[in-house]
Amino acid sequence: MAEEQPQVELFVKAGSDGAKIGNCPFSQRLFMVLWLKGVTFNVTTVDTKRRTETVHKLCPGGQLPFLLYGTEVHTDTNKIEEFLEAVLCPPRYPKLAALNPESNTAGVDIFAKFSAYIKNSNPALNDNLEKGLLKALKILDNYLTSPLPEEVDETSAEDEGISQRKFLDGNELTLADCNLLPKLHIVQVVCKKNRGFTIPEVFRGVHRYLSNAYAREEFASTCPDDEEIELAYEQVAKALK
């Protein structure tokens, strides 16, 4: 008889109305991991302005997101991800770790470059900061268009050309995607709203990647509303003046 699965509940930051999902890439990352694992779970949004006594009892520190697994409370996004990968494992649940270590660091600089770009109010610095973001996006694009080792046929004399894989580490979503995609979504929404900047079409690998990601329910359905992201960055994003 199959072992009964403990109750799994993910507590995430609520949006502006105190109920819907708010802007938090870490919350979305874990939401995606649980969905991809195929485990039965509940998501509870926590209004950071009005935390309930239950939430205070479960997690006195109040750091979001946090996970309730049976009676165990787990905090720290990286540790929660490691825990889920260890306990929700094959044969019952899929392994989500990337096969290629490089997939875990692809696009690693994008969010920092985006933050510097969006927080700047000095027009004289804008071009250089935008170039920094573009350079980070270019590095990701290069990774997405370069064939992975398993895509290369060593017996063929032909050039393997451009990778057509859907995601960072192949044709299935992995933990690497769960980490990067929520951040890329924020970059797109905030840059368009506050700088009129969109990811250049020349970055075909990035556009293919995002298009494939938005076609997946695990990503598209866990994204907060654009308005929630814009609201979260209202005080963070500076106008050029």
From Swiss-Prot:
The modification N-acetylalanine is found at residue 2. Residues 2-90 are annotated as: Required for insertion into the membrane. A motif (G-site) lies at residues 24-27. The modification Phosphotyrosine is found at residue 233. Residues 93-233 form the GST C-terminal domain. InterPro entries: CLIC (IPR002946), CLIC-1_C (IPR030259), CLIC_N (IPR053823), Glutathione-S-Trfase_C-like (IPR010987), Glutathione-S-Trfase_C_sf (IPR036282), Glutathione_S-Trfase (IPR040079), Thioredoxin-like_sf (IPR036249). It is found in: Nucleus; Nucleus membrane; Cytoplasm; Cell membrane. PROSITE patterns: GST_CTER (PS50405). Keywords: Acetylation, Cell membrane, Chloride, Chloride channel, Cytoplasm, Disulfide bond, Endoplasmic reticulum, Ion channel, Ion transport, Membrane, Nucleus, Oxidoreductase, Phosphoprotein, Transmembrane, Transmembrane helix, Transport, Voltage-gated channel. This is Chloride intracellular channel protein 1. The gene is CLIC1.
